[in-house]
Amino acid sequence: MKIENLEEKISNIDPNNLSENDLSVIEFTIQELDKGNIRVASQKDNEWLLNEWVRDAILLFFSIRNLKEISANDLIYYDKLEPKKNYKELGIRVVPPGVVRYGAFCEPGVVVMPCFVNIGAYVGTGTMVDTWATVGSCAQIGKNVHLSGGVGIGGVLEPAGAMPVVVEDGAFIGSRSIIVEGVRVKKGAVIGANVTLTASTPII
């Protein structure tokens, strides 16, 4: 299956009438998302563009997965998605009980403290996701970013057309800050502690 054909294939899927081929396309798309070969959003000419079909694939993926028990040593979870297991192969450091969910991608050199990175998220090399921070679904985090303790980066799977949160290279997000609703934090920006940024936050 070729990546360049996936957009058309996903766009033509009827969620109410899934064929075996449709299921294979959905599984393959999330597999490529998990490997970092495709992304929910991509940058072109200093603008971030939403790849709506990738997010559609995530929603379809949830619809075809069943809940099941997932073991992590003595811990038992009940969910549709397993956490990633190839941290060493990826070259990322994950401190217990940190979780990077299947379908998220972290470049080599990322440090994940006890925190959570959700499906569709992309985290660039050299970034620190500090203790109890959350990187929500589809969020795009650049290289050498510091997400301080307790930071909440909002996730966006719905509604259709909504942009994910983007934090660009070299940004610093202060402790307990909340960034949601498709906010774009540009390269090298510094956000102080306990700041909340939403799509309606006035910037003066």
PLM segments and residue spans:
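Structural signal for interior beta-strand "rungs" in well-ordered beta-sheet cores
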Residues: 92-204
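Terminal amphipathic alpha-helical/low-complexity segments used for targeting or macromolecular assembly
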Residues: 1-92
